[in-house]
Amino acid sequence: MDKRTENMLKEPIFPLLVNMSAPNTIAFLVQAVVVLTEVWLIGRLGTSALAAVALAFPVIMLTQQMAFGALGGAVSSSLARSLGAGDKQRAEELLWHALFLAACGALFFLSVFYISGELLLQILGGKGELLEQAIAYCRVFLLGAIVIWLSGTLSAALRGIGNMRFPALLIIFGSGLQVTLAGGLILGWFGLPRLGIIGAPLAAILSGIFMSSAMLIKLSYFSQEVELTLKRLSLKK
């Protein structure tokens, strides 16, 4: 029995819950600060840019909630059940299934937006320059959204195997990177090109690349509970 399992079976319940939930709580608070900071940065561009982000907000939130919530919750619980049953091989196969679903989700959202995204934003009230800015924002975000889906899936996988701290620390460091890049790419700080409103989704994508890469390396080379190896690559039922 490994130390983590022993702690879960023997430690008092309340301190155990606090210890396991604290990293995620702090990480999500940091993410909330990131959202507020990006809104402030975009607000420096003017009210039209801020309105364009508000118009694009439902598309962005739906993508993130599907990646981190719907798919992430399923991945976390399925891996936990497989490991709880002592079936490591199934857990590793499930991880590959999860990555495949993440890629499909990113492609589906991108395809739907390119087919009917402009109409959707018009229904939500977008027109003229406001609509053009919102479309540009969504296109940049969805073109790179595969890393958002991967981040949500991989962080859920790590939580499913009982590793709460690593994804939380990554979210905190990734959030710091995102804010720094957002300031540079939106407003031209730190000598970076001033891209305006599309700097925000680009910063999120670059931060997502950092986080998803770190989690892929962790699961491929430094994880004992579940290893992401090509020998488990299978899409069987």
Question: For the regions a protein language model found, what residue spans apply to each?
Answer:
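A generic structural signal for short, solvent-exposed coil/turn residues
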Residues: 34, 71, 150, 194, ...
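Helix-terminus/linker motif at the lipid-water interface of multi-pass membrane proteins
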Residues: 29, 33-51, 121-128, 184-195
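Small-residue-rich hydrophobic transmembrane alpha-helices
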Residues: 50-111, 148-167
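Alpha-helical transmembrane segments of multipass membrane proteins
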Residues: 36-40, 62, 111, 119, ...
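Residue-level hotspots within pore-lining transmembrane alpha-helices
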Residues: 26, 30, 34, 63, ...
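Short runs within selected transmembrane alpha-helices of multi-pass transporters and secretion channels
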Residues: 72, 76, 141-160, 167-175, ...
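Short alpha-helical transmembrane segments in multi-pass integral membrane proteins
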Residues: 1-21, 79-146, 180, 184, ...
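Signature of the first transmembrane helix
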Residues: 15-76
